[in-house]
Regions:
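Short, well-structured N-terminal submotif of metal-dependent ribonuclease cores
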Residues: 1-40, 44
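Structural alpha-beta junctions
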Residues: 9-13, 57-63, 120-125
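Acidic, PIN/NYN-like endoribonuclease modules and their adjacent C-terminal/linker elements
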Residues: 16-17, 21, 93, 97-130
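Amphipathic alpha-helical segments within well-ordered protein domains
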Residues: 25, 29-32, 57-60, 76
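Extended, non-globular alpha-helical segments
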Residues: 43-67
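Active-site neighborhoods of divalent-metal-dependent phosphate/nucleic-acid chemistry enzymes
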Residues: 58-106
């Protein structure tokens, strides 16, 4: 899938964390989970839904996974530093810090607590309009 112009620099890598990947898989696997992603896919052409399911269950090579093994200690340190976030947000902030990366969120999933914690710690963030 081509990346829209201006979305990210040509050499930039995209990563996801284990919990966020699990969340996407769960949204697609369960008919009882209703969120933004499952609603969009439920209303789409079946071929689009099948392609999305394949892309989520078999994470594309272009998306690098960040191991919980690499994030458990940084997450514990964030908590010790007084960061108060839920587990998914804590993992995302730890991953961004671990990778020295920009923390990107969809505007539909804007998370004021995560954005504030990142700002306090000097981590760059970006809201992506999907």
């Amino acid at each position: 899938v081509p990346v829209p112009a201006g979305l990210r620099p040509a050499q930039a890598r995209v990563f996801t964390t284990g919990l966020w990947h699990h969340r996407a898989c769960r949204a697609l696997a369960s008919s009882t989970v209703t969120g933004a992603l499952s609603r969009l896919l439920g209303a789409s052409d079946p071929a689009i839904g099948a392609a999305a399911l394949g892309a989520v269950t078999a994470l594309p090579e272009a998306i690098g996974p960040v191991s919980f093994r690499d994030l458990a200690w940084p997450m514990a340190r964030l908590l010790d530093d007084g960061v108060h976030l839920n587990l998914l947000s804590l993992e995302a902030l730890a991953a961004a810090e671990h990778l020295g990366a920009v923390l990107c969120l969809a505007t539909a999933d804007e998370n004021p607590s995560l954005l504030a914690a990142a700002a306090i710690r000097g981590n760059p963030t970006r809201l992506i309009h999907a």
